[in-house]
């Protein structure tokens, strides 16, 4: 619901940093992230710029992080989120009050800024521009899977709005000390700020290097991109423009979502054509990896989504969840292992490898439950598997949080044969619910799974390597004491955001201090 009254006083000054005590942070599941002991004078105002947030609209891990990290950071810094006004946002149960207006630039239309206050205190700024964002579908395309042809306009408008807010052009009585932009849709935020000579520091986080927001050079006039940006050191990318590269080129610092992935993307195998550029950033000390966390709602003992909550050692409770998952997917009753796939159905996720080992899993006494949506050809392949192995493999095309949580709780193993995985969240969710990942030894999977302790890793993106890891999983399943010991270790793994937040908080403080120092010398 959008308030029809324009609040000419803008945002509320009493909500600025330093004017209220640092609270504990409510998160889903009636859990609380306890404050870390840090001095309040270091508290900064931070604007998160993102194309999705799990509370309102989500297509993947970016939405989860955009919802969890600002909340986990709330006791350290005043973090607010800027997101486009999609229908899912405008028609949520949370009221929106118009607090400011922004003029247009080049082909980017004028828009309004709305403020949404979430029940737990998170402030979300909504970029209201009906001609760009009020469309049925995902944040990036129509329901038929095709990207919107004007995405370059839609997300350039998002980046420019962030720059405008940082320059206080929106006059909302809140101005960030730092702008934290996420993935290619927010890539032009650091760029516009740099081109204008704004001194506010910027941080750009790469969640997935493969999605680069590449558009034609002919888009420059529409977006107001200066000619000097069309260089290898700028946002030029093999004769085109890359929103992702713009974020990397002009941000004060770059992070990605795991230490291993930060190393991998500086190599040709994982660099997506940007390995040399990123290697240079690493050498300059401008690229680092900070792992994601997961919120404390991922607790099998208290999760309201589960029909039978259970705790470490309560394996009868886990078995009850397994029986429910088998019923959900039309699988036969079985005492064998249940494997889960909870994933976007895209090439990156290695689903063709799972398709190739499916017969081995079934012949060895296992079953597979698959949930997800994505590329049409991948969806068709998964449906074909279910038809080929009725009662042994079940597929649901689509996604909802409740079913996903129940699958993590009911499965014995999670299949994640990703060709690359910047961080990955599913493997952490699964471990919290006692489901052991069978995963490729890459990116965040390598950083969050202890091979033979909390899961099973394999090195090569081949059927043989994958099948060897599955063989180890079947052997462990045959020894309940060993299986349960691994489950205990997995469920106790420390993946909460409290641990992940500290490096971000320190980086924020360093970037702001550096920017202030540079300004003082000029």
Swiss-Prot record:
Chain positions recorded as ADP-alpha-D-glucose binding sites: 58
Enzyme Commission (EC) number: 2.4.1.21
Keyword Glycosyltransferase part of the UniProt annotation: yes
Pfam family, one: Glyco_transf_5
Listed pathway(s): Glycan biosynthesis; glycogen biosynthesis
Keyword tags: Glycogen biosynthesis, Glycosyltransferase, Transferase
GO biological process, one term: glycogen biosynthetic process
InterPro entries the UniProt entry points to: Glyco_trans_1, GS/SS, Starch_synth_cat_dom
Disulfide bonds: none
A GO MF label: alpha-1,4-glucan glucosyltransferase (ADP-glucose donor) activity
Annotated function: Synthesizes alpha-1,4-glucan chains using ADP-glucose.
Family in the record: Belongs to the glycosyltransferase 1 family. Bacterial/plant glycogen synthase subfamily.
Name of this protein: Glycogen synthase
Naturally occurring in which organism (per UniProt): Pseudomonas fluorescens (strain ATCC BAA-477 / NRRL B-23932 / Pf-5)
Gene responsible for this protein: glgA
